[in-house]
């Protein structure tokens, strides 16, 4: 390091790298779930840049100090941007978010756990057991408690996209955070499939799917669940 060069200039490349990483996380709209479930990673450098990340355990966006280099894509310039990218991820009960810890065993019976990365219930590999609460003796129990109730087309979760042109056309889109259809101004070209001519069409495609029976409550299966842990 040149002693004559101010410390701020040495930190400048770190700030630039941090900005690039932040932009990368924002542009990856197609992989929101993968990005948002990445663990907090402030990076190895020493800058203190205020950023936001999605906390998969608390299921909300939280502030952290980014070091300025490396890290991962779960790194947003603002809370609003974090919410736009990750806020529509389906919430699941705390029991389903518990980290899976396994150990070798010779029990032949199949058990199931909720994989937060895939948002599905999956069988434990043969020869593995677990005492964590995110393990269920029956697949139906796991699915009933943990798996998101999604009965709507995937495009209903797409963000509002006004398009690329300059027209001013009133359209409707499904706001996945509020679970309602709302108006927006469409510019006439580009955009995505979350774009409806009529409010009723948006409602039929995206709103009705959310009005299904509620997910099971933990009390519905707790005695049987604890029995299999003993």
From Swiss-Prot:
Disulfide pairs? 36-86, 45-69, 61-82, 96-146, 105-129, 121-142, 156-206, 165-189, 181-202
Official protein name in the record = Tissue factor pathway inhibitor 2
Against SUPFAM superfamilies, the record matches this protein to: BPTI-like (SSF57362)
Can you supply one Gene Ontology CC term for this chain's record?
extracellular region
- Please give the Gene Ontology molecular function terms for this protein: serine-type endopeptidase inhibitor activity
Q: Where is the BPTI/Kunitz inhibitor domain?
A: 36-86, 96-146, 156-206
Q: Which residues carry attached sugars according to the database record?
A: 168, 178
Biological process (GO) annotations held by this record are: blood coagulation
Q: Which CDD domains match?
A: Kunitz_TFPI1_TFPI2_3-like (cd22615), Kunitz_TFPI2_1-like (cd22616)
Tissue specificity statement from the Swiss-Prot or TrEMBL entry: Highly expressed in placenta. Also expressed in liver and kidney.
Domain text? This inhibitor contains three inhibitory domains.
Q: Which gene encodes it?
A: Tfpi2
State where the protein is found. Secreted
Q: How does it assemble?
A: Finds in a complex with ABCB1, TFPI2 and PPP2R3C; leading to the dephosphorylation of ABCB1.
Signal peptide per UniProt: 1-22
Which segments cross the bilayer? none
Top-rank taxon: Eukaryota
Tell me yes or no: is Cytoplasm among this UniProt entry's keywords: no
At the highest ranks, the source species' classification is: Eukaryota, Metazoa, Chordata, Craniata, Vertebrata
Q: Which organism is it from?
A: Mus musculus
